[in-house]
Amino acid sequence: MSTNSTPRKQKLSNSKSLQNSPISPTVKKTNSFPLGNNIPTNINRSKKDKNNNSNNNINNNNSNGIGSNTIINSTPIATTPVPPLPFIHSSSSSSSSPSPSSSSSSPFPKAKKSPSLSINQQQQQQPQQPQQSPQSQQSPQSQQSQQSQQQQPQQPQEQQEPLPNLSFLRNQEPDKNVLPTSRKRPPSVMPSTPNQSSNSSSLNSSLNFSSSNSSPSPTSTQSNNSRFETRSQNDQYENNNNNNNNNNNNNNNNNNNNNNNNNIECIVIDDDDDDDDDEGNSIKSTHTSTQSTPIRDRRQRDNKWTINPLPQFQREIIDVDTPSPPNESLSIVSQTTTNTITDTTSIQTPTLIRQSSSLLSSSSSLSPSTTSTPLTQNNINLQNAQVIATMTAPMEIELPTIVQLEPLFSSEFTTSTQNLFIQTPPFTSTLTLPTTTAQTSQTLFTIQTSHDINNNNNNNNNNKNKNKNKKEIEKEKEKLREALKQKLKEYENENEKEREKERKREREIEIERERKERERKEREKERKKEKEREREREERERKEIERKEREREEREERERKEIERKETERKEIERKEIERKEIERKERERKERKEREEREEREREERERKEREEREKEIEMEREKKKEKEKEKEKEKEKEKEKEKEKEKEKEKEKEKEKKRKENEVENEIEKERREKNDSYMVLNYHHSIDDHHSESESESDSDQDSIYSISTQELSSVISDNDFCDSDNEKVANNNRTVGETFLNDSRNNNNNNNNNKNNNNKKIENDKNQLIERERLISAFNDKAFLYALDTIREVLGGIDFKLKVSKEQIIEISTNAKKPLNILSEPEQQQQQQQQQQQQQHQQQQQQQQQQQQQQQQQTTKTTTTTNNTTTTTAETEKPKEVFLLKKPIKIPYGRDCKKRLIRRFHGTSRNPLFHKNLESTLKLLKRAKFDWASIEFDTKSYLMNCNCKTVCHKSERMKDNPTNKLQNNNRNNNNNNNNIINNNNNNNNKNNNNKNNNNKNNNRNNNSIAKKIGTNNNNNNTTIIKNNNNNNNNNNNNNNNNNNIIKNNNNNNKNNNNNNNTIVKKIETIKKDINKKPTKTTTTTSSSSSSTSSSNSLTVIKKPVKKINGSQRICLFEDDFDVGIGVPVTTGTSETTTTRASSIRRKMNISNIFDDFTKKPRQNKYNEIEMPDLFASKECNYTLEQQAPFIRAQKLLLTQQHENNLYNGKRFMKYDEWLDLYHGEMRSSIQNPKVLKHYISFSQEVYGEAEPTLLRHWIHLGLIKPTDVFCDIGCGIGNVLFQLAAQVGCRVIGVEIRKDLYDISQSMLEIYKKRSLELGLHPSTQQIKIYNCDVKGSLEFDFSEPNVFFMHNTCFGPELEISIMELFKKYSKPGTKVITMKTLCPRFKPSDKKTKPWGIFKYPYESYEMEEGSLSWRSATNCSFYSFTIDDKDSDIVTDQTHLNRVILSTPKKKHSKLQLFSSSSLPSSPPSSSSSSSPPNIATNTTTTTTTTTTTSPSSISLPSPYLSPSKKTPNSNKRDRSDIDNSNSDDGDENNNNININNNNNNSNNKPIKLKLSMDHSIDNQSNSESSDTDVEYMPWSKRNNRKKRKSLSYSLDSYLSSRISPSLSLSTSSSSSSSLDSSPYSSPPSSSSSDNENDDDNGDDEDDSSSSNDTKLKEKLLLMKNNEKIGGAPPLTRRNANSDTNKLVQGCYQSLSSYALPKEESQIHKLQLQAKLLEHKNSLVLKHQKSIHDQQKRLSRKQKKLAKKNKKKEQQLQAQAKTINYNNNNNNNNQNDNQVNHNNLNENEINTDLINGYNNNNNNNIINNDNDNDNDNDKDDDKDSNNKDYNNINDNNK
């Protein structure tokens, strides 16, 4: 049978059955190897390596040698195991006519793309197999015949039988142990074309490949990943049984002639990697014989299996049926173990096999446990021509036909049968090489030579054909058919998979085509859209052109209208200008007429004035002549007096030495008692380390009492300012103090020696001054202890900022007081205990001595003569009572809040409503001081006495706090002394001279005791000393006011004396209910020696103590602050141990205090629980928030002022824009000029670039509140488009500056600025409206303008970050001036503590700040309902100690500028009254320049007359009945010459001030807490008034009293002083004023009504101007705002406002804190005005009763008074002095009344009832009935003038 095979690449199938396919191998010999023991072949697989491929592959050339045309024959041997055979399936059949080209060379495609055999081809193969003989399946002769038939196509072929039935190969069941094949596509083996040029058919040999793994490892297997795929050149083959023998014979003959050696090459296509499938190269497979292991080489790219070359062999036919002899055959045994194939396994030597039936019938599964034995040389038999070839060199086997191999090298795969179908070109028959059964253990392969092939084949075929049966052949055919069917199914499956892949590829192509189509369509759509856009662009351009054309037309129309409007406005302006000129002409004429009238009036007045002056000059000439005569007489008298005084001085010096010694003993005892009981002064025990010198200081304390050196708090302030109050080391403090103590002791000894040695007074003064200067420097060095200084300053602030004085003596005693009265012991605690024990012992001894001294003094008073006593009093008072220096702080020291103790103290006050201004619970504050770093000092303080004597006039006067009060002790002592004095007076009623002597003695004792007290009470706190002085002043005034009564008692009337004592006792009993525990020991009070104290010789031993008036730059000032207010309680003064004192009952009444009134009203004791009278929480609110309702009255008044200013501006040619005009301009032109309004909203949310506008309504609100004025420089930080700047510039005319960070908004503002300038020029606005500058910069960066210029800033800081706000506040602190305002939409002060002034950035602002509620629609971004804007004021940066004296004076004198509800202008002691003079009542007031001459200095004061606005002061209609004489009162603490100066001043004043006339003034008081006008704010007081008093509200607004020129000059310009219209005002330069004239209460009320009528009759224009003037003054002053807090409806909220303002004293400068204190006092008193009104009636009735009694006494004693004056002339030659003293007593009598007036004025009793009470007091105290008083007063003063002459 001839076969034509075409090479095609087919896929490998995973079949489990063994199939044989025909191949035509040619064995190519490359090298010859000697025969050896181990002759296996190794398989090397090379992958992707062409170099290795070239090295390993051998050229396919024909070569001469042994083994050409070999045929594989296998012989089973039962003794050896069968090696695994390859599953080789026939995939193609031979064609009818083979050609050399087809057999020699044919290209092979890729293994993946090579299809399997088709179904038709397989059907053609099936009928050939059953035609074989039963003995053998196919013989070699048949194969040769088939090959010859193929080579001869001309021969007609017979009908071919179908392929033999291969079903027997599939019938057997597979072994259960066999595993399925791998799913991975096995490699495909493609045959390479042999290089054979011969036309002869090649050998057809059957190969049995028994191969192991390709890896070098003996245990690894990779055979299941590879397949041998053999393909024939033709797709079909045919078997012809009839011609088998012939064909075989022919083929054998042909083969015998062909002795060429052929190479057999097996090409294996491996599909392990994907790269192999992509490439179309076939893979050669060579089996090598090295190490008997087939190595699979992966280095070759073409994936060829290279079979190592076969050894040279001799051809010999071996009969399969009979075993060959051992010397004639070569057996190659394949040995394998389980799951492995040993290294010796290889493709064994191929032999020609003669198939037998036994082999065909025998089929078994391939066992993997077969073993192979290597070839040996002993098995070769060369003699019998049966040469067994031994592989000696590598050899390639080329397979021209397609061979399909199943994976056989894996131990996982076994089959029942393994047949090798080989179809070669020279043979026509198919040889089947079945595998042996499991029992066969060895297979013998022999190689036969080619010349024996034909003979052996014929013999074998004949023998086999005979033995075979037809049944067996049919069975085999059936088996073959079944196998082919199964194979066909597999091929169909493979074809289906290939078709599926092709379908997938088609789908992919289709998808790609669709994608391209879709892209094409999209491109088309894009082109269409582009065309549409082009059309739209053209349309838009066309519309834009149309729009511009339309806008141009509109612009032209608008310009035309604008021209018309301008023309109409021009005409209107011209019309208004004509009208304005007409009005101006009329106004000018009216003014000229008025000026002409005024000029005539002035000329007339000038003529009258000249005439009057001429008359006055003549009178003055006469007076001067009289004075010169009197002076000459006085000089003669003075010379006589001086001679007598020199004689008396020597006697008195000896007495003074004894007195000093006794006084020192008394003082030491008193000091010890003071320390034990802590009476009304602060003790600060400083622990110095002076133990070594303490004994010396105690021993010398008695003799050196005068060496006391003082330092002022002004000097202390300089020390404190140099020190930073940081903690100092204890050792340094101790060393400093030790050295200071030593220096003081040494210097004190030297000073004492000098004082003893120097006898002259002048030398003493010089030495003392030097020593004082030295000791002051040392004291300053001693105060280097910073903690001590800090403690002193802290105590000073706790006490309300009272000025005090420090002194240091040689005993290391430091005195802290206002007048240096009581020293402080600087001793340790054990030393203090010793002193206390000594004091107790000395106290008992002292009491005994005092009793003895009292008896002695009583005897001396009876025996001494009047002449000597009077002289002694004048001398002793001049010498012993020397004035002491008082160093006052012009401005209290201000220390930064840097220490923990101070912080804790202030925090305690703030948190618990315990403000030091109200002196509540001071004990707790002192405990805090003890705890806070003051371990070295013990601070003790008598808080109860301080609360009794404090000046706050609030709740602190409680009955429970009045224990252990020194003033109470004074009263008890005075009561006892009154009893003693009464006894003395009663015993001496008959002797007038003796009475006068008693008076003089009492004056001596008083002066002496006062001097001693002045030395001892040096450490009293300021407040205590001042209060004691005030009480003494009151007592002296009381005593002086009782001159008439006391004179009557002394001379004639014991009954009157008893009545006065009874009155005193009744009033004292009332005071005793409040004051207890007084009667233990006498207390010393401070006195200020003055002319009043020396003049008490004629007033029955009554000491007159006046409060010192503080000095500033040598000029006296009014006590304006609360520390200077007089307590005003009438307490009698101790004048010694046995002096007589009497007091007037009416003067000892209790002060109208809120707490006292409340006690009397409720008739219950005061409780410590909270009530409405006590202070509420200070932190009820954080700021002063003003509602729209509270702003309304102020805005109404401001509108009137603005309208008036607008009219004035128009009158002066200044035109500003109105609000309506601005709205038209802004919304009509400026706003519409913004092309793209959406630009305003292009910002980042919640950033500093957020844009929000302030609407014009908000700016109008600012203007109405007066926050922005034409003189201001306004700066808007974040101005946006500049709408705020334009409006303020247009309406106010101020200079404006804008800062904007956004460039787009800045550009819009510049365009709007151009529009604004054009429009303003058209309207004719003032040039000040053009001062607009806008900068595009960042505030945090570099500024383009001067930041210090603006004084009003605005920040719309709703979205400003904290960093930006802090940086802006730092700029304020660095550049802005004090008083600069900052308006914000969000508060810059989140919280406030006093320490924030120095530590926080918002400390630059004053506190509390203000917030104002906004109108609705004030902001663009919200409705602004219930929203507020904030107003901050930058505080003074230099808020520390101010040493500029002129600045302080200016502040003190300008404090009353603040219009307030209660004008607290002067204290009670600063306005004493003077007795009337004898001049006529009709004469106008005069000004007489008065020179007060003294022995040492001469001071002159110029007259002052001030004309002030009428709302505050206006002259009353009623003129006083008689002129009264002023009396001077010199402050002893500020003078250096004592009583001598005072005496001279009294004489001059008595002579010069006789014709002065007082001026009646009226103060208009405002009750408004809101600081508004009287008409608007008086409604708040109606609630507290009785219904009967509401109609008299106008009466309560005015108070009539008189002022002198000095006080009027100290009052602020808001007060007006005016005189009668017919005469000019002239006042005396005396510092005291005259009291009002004597009149009844009814007449006084009538006068008040008349004044109110005059006020109401004034024109409306003047009232309006007055109201506006008040508001304007309010703005200039600053301080508290002019409006009230929000919801200030209840009384407690009003108090909260006042308390909160007082709290600012911790944060504000001292000047402003004083203003707040004044405001607080007034508001508290206003709040309690209702209680005062209810209690007034009872007080008024009591005063009436007292006044009636005094009137009766005055009528009875008129004659007796005249007798006393006559007796005084005969008793002493100094009658003038005595008479002056009597007049002074009467002045004091009036002085108390005036004090009551002033205290009532300060306390706020400014209603009509108060006026009535005061006027009644004045009438009751000074005068009798309306008719009798005039005569009596005139007679009295006429008598006095006669005596003076």
Swiss-Prot record:
GO terms for molecular function: histone H3K79 methyltransferase activity; histone H3K79 trimethyltransferase activity. PANTHER family: HISTONE H3 METHYLTRANSFERASE, HISTONE-LYSINE N-METHYLTRANSFERASE, H3 LYSINE-79 SPECIFIC. The keyword Protein transport does not apply. This is Histone-lysine N-methyltransferase, H3 lysine-79 specific. One of its GO terms (cellular component) is nucleus. Residues 1-67, 83-306, 450-470, 486-571, 585-681, 741-767, 862-881, 963-1102, 1463-1559, 1610-1661, 1735-1762, 1772-1791, 1799-1845 are annotated as: Disordered. It catalyses: L-lysyl(79)-[histone H3] + 3 S-adenosyl-L-methionine = N(6),N(6),N(6)-trimethyl-L-lysyl(79)-[histone H3] + 3 S-adenosyl-L-homocysteine + 3 H(+). Residues 1745-1759 have a biased composition (Basic residues). It is found in: Nucleus. Its EC number is 2.1.1.360. Belongs to the class I-like SAM-binding methyltransferase superfamily. DOT1 family. Residues 1125-1446 form the DOT1 domain. Residues 295-304, 585-679, 1069-1080 have a biased composition (Basic and acidic residues). CDD domains: AdoMet_MTases (cd02440). SUPFAM superfamilies: beta-sandwich domain of Sec23/24, S-adenosyl-L-methionine-dependent methyltransferases. Residues 52-67, 90-162, 191-226, 239-263, 453-464, 750-763, 862-877, 972-1011, 1020-1067, 1084-1102, 1467-1522, 1541-1556, 1610-1642, 1799-1817, 1835-1845 have a biased composition (Low complexity). Keywords: Chromatin regulator, DNA damage, DNA repair, Methyltransferase, Nucleus, Repeat, S-adenosyl-L-methionine, Transcription, Transcription regulation, Transferase. Pfam families: DOT1 (PF08123). Histone methyltransferase that specifically methylates histone H3 to form H3K79me. This methylation is required for telomere silencing, correct growth and development, and for resistance to DNA damage induced by UV LIGHT. In contrast to other lysine histone methyltransferases, it does not contain a SET domain, suggesting the existence of another mechanism for methylation of lysine residues of histones. Its main location: nucleus. GO terms for biological process: DNA damage checkpoint signaling; DNA repair; methylation; regulation of sorocarp development; subtelomeric heterochromatin formation. Residues 1-44, 282-294 have a biased composition (Polar residues). The gene is dotA. S-adenosyl-L-methionine binds at residues 1251-1254, 1274-1283, 1300. Residues 625-639 are annotated as: Required for interaction with nucleosomes and DNA. Disruption phenotype: Individuals exhibit 4-5 hours delay in development. Development does progress with fewer fruiting bodies and smaller spore heads. No apparent changes in cell cycle regulation.
